[in-house]
Structure formats: structure tokens, C-alpha cells
């Protein structure tokens, strides 16, 4: 099936030119191209059109889960009839195994898996295994982490069709080999049950159940049914059932793996004894032998991923299989915010190896644990056939890879211009800045101020508050959820000024901000590099009155580059607007507050948090921060009976699962904290 893009919008501005150039580059075999697009220019829409034009399976790489979720939702909107999938880490919580020799502390691995994301990950792999060409996978850096190989996955696909002669028990054995679990009592995702001549399989990558019925040894019908009502949804002549886990292997390979593990255990035990370290020798012997017993009896053990090299049949040092192995060789890679995403890929391997070094050296793991790892950057690079790097500030790597093939997208559909940049001396900068702030507040506009240190941010905020300016600060010591609330409060007018250290975060969308003030702009370093200054200045690009003031006594090379590049873009935008009679329009964006903004609202939310409902036509929901919830809701909770508490826990659990299904992880975390508090109250009531 071909890609079919669906949108009420048509490419405008320089989007058509960017789409054409990128499409031609891919069709002509260009290995790498850069899409240099300014904030708000519709880069995602451009990429969607390119994907539709070239018709290649595409991996879109983002540098965090939240932005990946946004891209996933956008792409699903553009391609409702195609396979748009989501592949990120499925851990709600993850504490990796570690050993701290200085304190002789061993930290056991601890984790909580998000069932909904696990389903989406399996759905992504299943779509790729199906051979479809119209597949888009939006992924975080998880795509470079180890998983089962495509050959083993292919071998465990169960293909059935109506009229097929197939012994039912043989079919059940195949399901078990594909890591489905029999459960005749409660059918859950990844389970199957048997009732007479009917087998129900709750697909690991779907919300529905596959029902297969037999007539003697012949498959009589194949139907998809609703997992709750069991009403028939569809009938099939043939069907492919994909494995229930990404780490599938055969029994033969498992037996080979156990023998290899035992051989390596003997070698490692002898090594520790040869250096006179009997404690480590005893430790590795006990731990590995216990794991072997678990694998023989149950087919798995805690930390089985550390033995993945043996189960995959890989040699020592050979790279693991990852999501990229499931794509055809000519797939297209799109790296969003590439100036951040590419360095992140390069950093994964070193951190993983450093942690495992102590585990191996002190006898907690065999050396094979090193081979359960993310790809090195060189390995990742070797698997890329064609790539588009998307960024407003592409780094040297992307520019070098593209060999100058840079496609610019500088025109915004709204006609908004890049902000003017003005340099002012640092002498009396605070008084000057205060005057600028008052000018903005009279127009009901907002101000961002970026400093070099946390202390400066806090002291400047205190100064502004003493001068009756509604100000707040935000930096890394402020909790993530509090930062989100501060951003929403800034937009809502609770604050007029936000002071921070690093306010250049990609995706920070604050259309009310008309002034960005950069203090100590001439202090060269990471926070005042050309790319950081450009990203920071871009925060004022969503307001029709956008302006940037750099306070500095000298103009550094980074400042000059930012000023020159912004002026160049601005002149192009002005000319385009003049030629086409476009008047810049202020962006109007609804404020969707995720948290209560007052004690009264928090109290109302606490009273009704167990009755939150997404009514038809309504999107409003109430969140409670963990500390606020404890403070305002305890009197209500304490008055509840055991039955009411149990009902509240069940209702909130359902809401948590729905939030996770909607990829709203922040809300899911809020519900989780509420559940923990309710359970604690229930335990106290006995």
C-alpha cells in the first residue's frame, strides 16, 4: 500500500520548495540531507510530504519520549490509513543493576513496565515483519538498544488460513514457542485460552482477540472479536500471528546457549581463582548456576538480557540486533532536532559499559553482559542508507554528512518573522531590563530572561519581585512537574517574567513571549554558543512583537553568527511577506494546564479526582501534584470507607491506564501517585 497523506492544509511558503528538493535528493540517492527549518515553519508537515513522495519505510528518531509522542500523534493524523507506529522505552520506572565497590553496595535491577507502550513496541515490530512498505516508526534512542533478531522473530510467526489441515495441539505448541501463555481463567494481552474446538488469542500487539475455531483437524474460521464483549469485528481467510515478545528464541538455541554459558562460567571462575579471589569466583558460580536453573525450568530468569549474546548466536563483541535490523536496507531515517539527538546516540554506549564494568570485574556478571548493549555510534552510522537531519541549528556532524546539501525552510505559514536582535551594554542592564519588562507587561506580553547560573536566576527573580514584577525562576533544581506548571502559569498571566539558566529547550512553545533577554551574552561557552543563542532567540519567534536583547560588552563570534543568521532569515521573510501581501498573524494557542493553578482549584480537583471523566465534547481534566494532593485531599480520603477506597483505587487505575494509552505519561504518573496514597490509606484502615 502506498503512503496517503491526509491534511486540510496545503504546503505554503517555502514548504513546496523544501519538499521538492528533499524528495529529489532521496530519489537521486543522496545519503544525507539537512532540513534547516526555523521554529514554527511546519517542518513535520514537510517531512510527512517527503515520506509520501518517496514511499520508503521510515524511522523518525526523536531525543525524548514526549517529543516522540507528539510526532507520533501528528504522523498518525497525516497518515490515518498507513502503519504509523511508536517505539520508545517501555519502562515507567527503571533502576539498572549496578555495583558500587567503594561502599560494597549491590543494587538490584528494579523496573515497572508500561503495558501499553509494550503493546505499541510489539506493534511496530509486527508491522515491519509483515513486509509492508507504508510503515513509519517514531522512536526514541531505544531503537539502538538490543532485542531479538529478525530471523528468530520470522521463524516464530504463525501463518494460518481457513481450510488448513492443522492439529490443534500442534497449533498450541506453536503459540507457546511464540511466547504466548495459556490462561483459561483470565485472558490478558499475550495470553491464549482453549474452549473445546475454539482457541482465543489476545494478541500482544493489539487491543482485540483472535478467535480460531476447528472442525476436526481443519481450521473452520478465523475471526477478530472485541476483547470485552467478544462481538465479531472481522473475518479472515488467512492470518499471521506475530510473537508475543521481542526476545524470542528456539529450544535448540536455548540448549546451545546453556552449554556456552556453562563453558564461560568455568573460564571466569578459573580466572578469579587464578588471581586468588575466591569470593568473586564463588559469587559468579552461584549467580550463574541459579540463572541456569531458572532458564531450564521456566525459560527465563531475572537479568536474562545479560545472556542475550548466547541466545542470539552472536560472537564476542558482535553488535546486538536492534530495531534498525527490521527495516529494509533502503529505509529512510529522519532525525528530529538532530543537533541534540545525534550526540545522544553517541553517548549511550559509554555509559552502559561503564556501569557493567564493575558488575563483571566483581563477579556479578559474565563478560558476555558487555554484549547486551546499545549500538556504538559507528555501528549506528553503518546501518544508515539515507537520512534527513531536521534542525533549526544543525551541528557540524550533520553539515559534514550532508556535504552542503542543506534545504532551508524559513517562511512561517503565519507570516511571523524571526525576532529583531539588539545588543546593549551590561552596565545598568538590570534597570534597563526592568523598563523593558514594564513595557511588555502593559501590553499583556511575557518575558524570558536567561542567566548563566542558578544563583543569578534566583537573585534576579527576588529583585523583580521586590519591584512588583510577577516573576518566577526555573532551572534543573525545580521539579519537572513544577516546571510544567510554571510554564503554564507564565502563559496564563500568573507570572509576567520567567528567569532561567537554560531556556533553549526544543519544543518550548510560548506564543505570549515577546521579549527574550540574554544576560552575559558575551561569556563564551555551552550556554552562549552560536546554537544555544539561536535556539534561545527562537523562543521569541512565535510573537508578532518578538524581540531579543543581548546584554554584553563585546560581540563574540557566536553572537555575531546568531545576529547575522537571524538578520538573513528575517530579510528573506520580510521580502516574501511583501511580495505576497502577507501580514504577520499572532499565534493563538489554547492553554491546556495540566495542573491546578490555585488552592481552590486543587481542592475541587481533590474532591472530584475519583470522578474525572472525559465527557463528550470536553477535553478538560484535573491533575493533582503528589505533595498538593496529600495536603488538600487527606480530610476527604480519611472520611472514606474501605469500600469507597477500593472503588476509588479501581477507578483511578482505569484512568491511569487510559492516560498511558493516550501517551500522556505525566497524567499517568499523577494517577499512579494518587493510587499509592489511596492504597496506603486503605492499609491503615486494615
What are these regions (language model features)?
Residues 87-98, 109-120, 451-456, 472-488, ...:
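Conserved helicase motor
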Residues 27-34, 56-57, 133-135, 445-446:
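Pre-Walker A (Motif I) flank of P-loop NTPase domains
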Residues 1-36:
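Conserved pre-motif I regulatory segment
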Residues 57-69, 86, 280, 440-462:
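Conserved strand-helix element at the start of the C-terminal RecA-like helicase core
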Residues 34, 87-432, 436-442, 461, ...:
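N-terminal cationic and glycine-rich segments that engage phosphates or anionic surfaces
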